[in-house]
């Protein structure tokens, strides 16, 4: 969803929706990697039923990553995708269903955004290549050092589009991957797997939502199914709320801004290509072969709990004294609808509503003030009440002028602060900064410039002599680097962006000045604002778009042909008289075919993915559709600072002209291209342990060509139709690996079959309600009346999925170490930097039980009697504290240890404060609960939950 910063805004406003994933890493023994056993209980204290993968969010980072070296070829890309799915699977561990959805042919409304994105990617890629070559030639001409240019084929990410050979090969590889895991991974043993590849029309996330909607409408659906959806798009949050499922979680990779990226020329960090100077890299050691490698830090995953977001929204949207019955489900639907006004993949956002300016909060406040007058909610099951929406939009229009003026004031204030900050930093800089091997550096800074040189003066002197001998003359104006070596490119002028005043983008509209509406329509639409007919046409198209998008989220695609025919949105104050505007769409429309979509979204530079005769239509000057493929196009910054925030002014594709031109080249398609140009469906896979396995085998043995109903009692209530798969994977047949580096499956027990969701009439309405029998999860947020009803008890926030999760405590040795190095009181501690004291014994007297296991720890043979032990006393007497759980039975080995240590007196081994003991602590814990120890005036507290590392 095209809402930049939406997730950041959401996670800051509602912080409890985020939970960090607990991930069990694969182990390695003697060079052999041992995979994670996903059949074991989930370490996140929650069990998921269904896992849905929006595959395009996995394909892109695996094929062209930004923070690590890119795969060398297509085979490595496929292996990277497999490993990414394995990692997600080991975190979520679904028990019923794995649904993998790849983007197929998108609706016409989405194709405009895809076209803009692909044209931009092509243009930016060519511009980056030209700039890179220019800087390289400039550096080499001045004597700079650059690594030899690596000759490799550039990966065009535009190939990740339905209809290309890459996507066809990906589908084959995923079939092999599913068969391999169902045969060999115990976590996949009883799993149903559905693959919806790029031949099935529809966006990946919307194919997933369509599956959920259709299954919810079946009588055998479990209303308490726990769904987990993987994807990074903001619209997944809206789609998850639109299902009205009580248990819905989103897993996504945690976004860490400002990740360091290497320079494309010298592979060094800290600068971009335009700032590269071709300096030699300072290696940390003499033989540092890894100095030129990129850091490959593995990203972390987080859970986004939509049930907690529903709690937040219920509190925020609850209103008293309504003239109608309050319904939290309808209120959440209205909130989802209002989020569309700040932008999405199908419509531009309104000029007065920016997510960074808390536009959603403003809309919610207006909604709560106006809803008493509307007489009801804005939406119902994906259909919009335009009369009520008009009241909301006109209320926004009344404050548009003040919004524009405040935006200008905030921008001017920010620029003024930034300018003062630059001046202050420039003023505080020293007039002279020493450099070279005699430069003073902070103690212990191993990465400081010159630290390696200064550590070996003889080597440094030798290298300087050799360098002087190899350089016959050095100009007095030559600049030197921090290690004393001359810079090959001295005297480079300061770049314009380093100056105190940065040029601001030209803004001819000036929304903060009077006459902003006239200037806006003149500059953006080339029309007069007084032209009421044109303004109404723009508003009507936008209103149709709002209705289409909401229907798309709640009911499915209302029309495959509809699209918004303008680059810009109208003003909120223009939404007058929209109550009478039609919001119906043409029925019976069909999606584009894959190769037709490629012709509609690809620039001419990506024509190599198309058949030769089709490609010619994009570049031949005599082509009837040559105007669809401009070599260059304007980008309107639209008041923004960066080009990626601007609007690409591309011509819209005329579907009628495109189809007419393609009719002449359709006969040129080969049988393989014709197959790739056809629309397909979903495929279902099961292993030999699944109840459906024998049922599907019987269908293949009978050879029936008629669709057969899926027996819901054999697959957790899933319903639909089965039909035989021409490219089926069958038991006792070898599954050949499409990736040469992976082995063939010679002992296969997996079977696949075509699967089709339950079908409904075109005018059927899926009810946006919580199903009967659904149980809401326990509340996570602090009750608003907690202070009144808690009787003084302190609120304990829920940190994970389970409030009764058993904390894992540190053992005795860890507490001794922490107690030694941490401060003793309000001061810093006299041994805060000292190493832990050496242990005089091995083993732990009390070892905590591992959750879910009954492991008996081995008693160390060298554990000596207590009267001969002279080590430091333990800081804490280890105990078990289980919140909300009854006391566990005392195991025999625990009773034995207690009996053995019954005569132990904790104060008989006290030592003086010093390296071998512990300084006395302040007696400030008298009010804490615990078991008093002899010799102390305060009881000890239980192990802190601060170190709850499970």
Swiss-Prot record:
Alphabetical list of InterPro entries matching this protein: 5_3_exoribonuclease, Xrn1_helical, Xrn1_N, Xrn2/3/4
Keyword Nuclease tagged: yes
Enzyme nomenclature, EC number: 3.1.13.-
Keyword Ribonucleoprotein on entry: no
Basic and acidic residues: bias regions: 920-937
Pfam families for the chain: XRN_M, XRN_N
Modified residues (Asymmetric dimethylarginine): 824, 847, 851, 880, 883, 946
GO BP, one annotated term: mRNA processing
A Gene Ontology cellular-component term: nucleolus
Phosphothreonine: residues carrying this PTM: 439
Phosphoserine modified-residue sites: 448, 471, 473, 475, 482, 487, 499, 501, 678
CDD domains the record matches: PIN_XRN1-2-like (cd18673)
Residue numbers of N6-acetyllysine PTMs: 286
Region: Disordered, residue numbers: 408-508, 912-950
Lineage: superkingdom: Eukaryota
Biased composition (Basic residues): 416-426
Molecular functions per Gene Ontology: 5'-3' exonuclease activity; 5'-3' RNA exonuclease activity; RNA binding; transcription termination site sequence-specific DNA binding; zinc ion binding
Residue spans, zinc finger CCHC-type: 261-278
In-chain residues carrying the UniProt-annotated modification Omega-N-methylarginine: 824, 847, 851, 883, 895, 946
Sequence ranges of Polar residues compositional bias: 445-458
Keywords: Acetylation, DNA-binding, Exonuclease, Hydrolase, Metal-binding, Methylation, mRNA processing, Nuclease, Nucleus, Phosphoprotein, RNA-binding, Transcription, Transcription regulation, Transcription termination, Zinc, Zinc-finger
Oligomer and partners: Interacts with POLR2A and SMN1/SMN2. Interacts with CDKN2AIP and NKRF. Interacts with CDKN2AIPNL; the interaction is direct. Interacts with TRIM71 (via NHL repeats) in an RNA-dependent manner. Interacts with DHX34; the interaction is RNA-independent.
Job description of the protein: Possesses 5'->3' exoribonuclease activity. May promote the termination of transcription by RNA polymerase II. During transcription termination, cleavage at the polyadenylation site liberates a 5' fragment which is subsequently processed to form the mature mRNA and a 3' fragment which remains attached to the elongating polymerase. The processive degradation of this 3' fragment by this protein may promote termination of transcription. Binds to RNA polymerase II (RNAp II) transcription termination R-loops formed by G-rich pause sites.
Name the record gives this protein: 5'-3' exoribonuclease 2
Organism name: Pongo abelii
Species classification: Eukaryota, Metazoa, Chordata, Craniata, Vertebrata
Gene: XRN2
